[in-house]
């Protein structure tokens, strides 16, 4: 396994980087623009009712266009501005059916903002001109792909999509441009992004992707532990136990996204949840391995081992497999330096 202090970022400037630390192992080793596009842009592929053959897909491009250019019509179909503000923007109700504001802040503002800041730091380390602009384009492209992929074949706009693209996604980017905000989330809340080892099969199926916001909040009453939360299309709270050399073990159990329904009249997203959770091993915030189990049919058991863990060919490669309820198996490899795009295969 790679040395815990190894990094492509010199020690003299490490403090300037809050979410990307250039670790040549774990999830850090897979970061790149394609990794963001596949893991964030297609995050809802984790729902079991999503078609994961992304090269032959009826994307909702017209839906996104109409949501942005016909905002008035989109809001009217949703029930008016009062309804939009009550359910999408302001936490005025804690009834489950009115909790749409929660994923807007957690997924689009916080997870999206941290993702943008992380890829901006990656661009800066790799000498990409105007890293802030490059990160903005990468993150917003992922956000647009997410909405197009979430609304296949939908031609009319929706207030939900408009709020995501015009308010919450830009708000997250702007918020985490501020060093004070990013430092608070990174240092005080232990915020990280743990992404899947996204793979493409020869038939064009996208597998094993996902983008999750991780929080580790230290528990002063129990030394060496933190309150752990994994959020994205899941919410699995638990605990982290801090070991030596920056090695942490985390446990989290709760809800996993199972089905994403779309209201044909309003374009409103209606998720269904299932029980799930997992165990996670990371070093210095870079995810090394994870085991996830859930009631979601197409990912009953998911095992990921990231680059730098298996000492074969210099620890360059990672591996993963997914067991489905039907007994079908998906498996694949990832590679450090491949910008987050791996090769997958399967047995049905």
Identify the meaning behind each predicted range:
Residues 142-167:
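Interfacial helix-loop-helix junctions of multi-pass membrane proteins
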Residues 1-113, 207-228, 240-249, 259-274, ...:
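N-terminal targeting leaders of membrane proteins
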Residues 161-212:
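Extended amphipathic alpha-helical segments with heptad-repeat/coiled-coil character used for oligomerization
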Residues 103, 129-139, 160:
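Membrane-interface starts of transmembrane alpha-helices
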Residues 124-134, 178-195, 265-267, 312-313, ...:
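Short loop/turn motifs that connect adjacent beta-strands in outer-membrane beta-barrel proteins
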Residues 120-121, 129-131, 153-156:
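Long, acidic/polar, low-complexity amphipathic helices and coiled-coil-like
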Residues 91-98, 121-129:
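Short juxtamembrane and helix-loop transition motifs at transmembrane-helix boundaries
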Residues 110-126, 166-182, 338-346:
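Membrane-interfacial alpha-helical segments at the cytosolic side of multi-pass membrane proteins
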């Amino acid at each position: 396994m790679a040395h815990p202090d190894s990094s492509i970022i010199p020690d003299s400037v490490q403090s300037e980087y809050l979410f990307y630390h250039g670790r040549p192992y774990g999830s850090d080793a897979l970061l790149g623009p394609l990794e963001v596009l596949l893991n964030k842009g297609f995050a809802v592929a984790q729902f079991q009712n999503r078609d994961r053959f992304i090269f032959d897909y009826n994307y909702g491009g017209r839906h996104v266009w109409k949501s942005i250019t016909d905002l008035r019509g989109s809001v009217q179909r949703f029930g008016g501005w009062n309804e939009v503000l009550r359910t999408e923007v302001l936490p005025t109700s804690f009834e489950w059916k009115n909790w749409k504001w929660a994923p807007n802040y957690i997924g689009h503002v916080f997870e999206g903002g941290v993702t943008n800041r992380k890829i901006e730091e990656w661009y800066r380390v790799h000498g990409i001109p105007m890293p802030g602009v490059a990160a903005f384009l990468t993150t917003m492209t992922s956000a647009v792909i997410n909405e197009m992929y979430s609304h296949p074949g939908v031609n009319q706009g929706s207030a939900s999509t408009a709020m995501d693209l015009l308010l919450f996604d830009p708000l997250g980017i702007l918020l985490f441009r501020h060093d004070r905000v990013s430092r608070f989330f990174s240092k005080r809340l232990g915020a990280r992004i743990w992404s899947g080892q996204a793979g493409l099969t020869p038939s064009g199926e996208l597998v094993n992707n996902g983008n999750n916001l991780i929080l580790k909040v230290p528990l002063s009453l129990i030394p060496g532990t933190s309150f752990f939360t994994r959020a994205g299309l899941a919410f699995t709270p638990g605990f982290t136990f801090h070991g030596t050399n920056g090695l942490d073990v985390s446990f989290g159990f709760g809800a996993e996204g199972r089905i994403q329904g779309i209201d044909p009249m309003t374009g409103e997203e209606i998720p269904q949840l299932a029980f799930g959770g997992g165990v996670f091993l990371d070093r210095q915030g870079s995810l090394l391995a994870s085991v996830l189990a859930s009631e979601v049919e197409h990912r009953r058991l998911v095992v990921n081992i990231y680059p730098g863990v298996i000492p074969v060919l210099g620890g360059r490669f990672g591996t993963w497999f997914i067991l489905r309820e039907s007994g079908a198996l998906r498996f694949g490899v990832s590679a450090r330096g491949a910008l987050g795009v791996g090769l997958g295969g399967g047995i049905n």
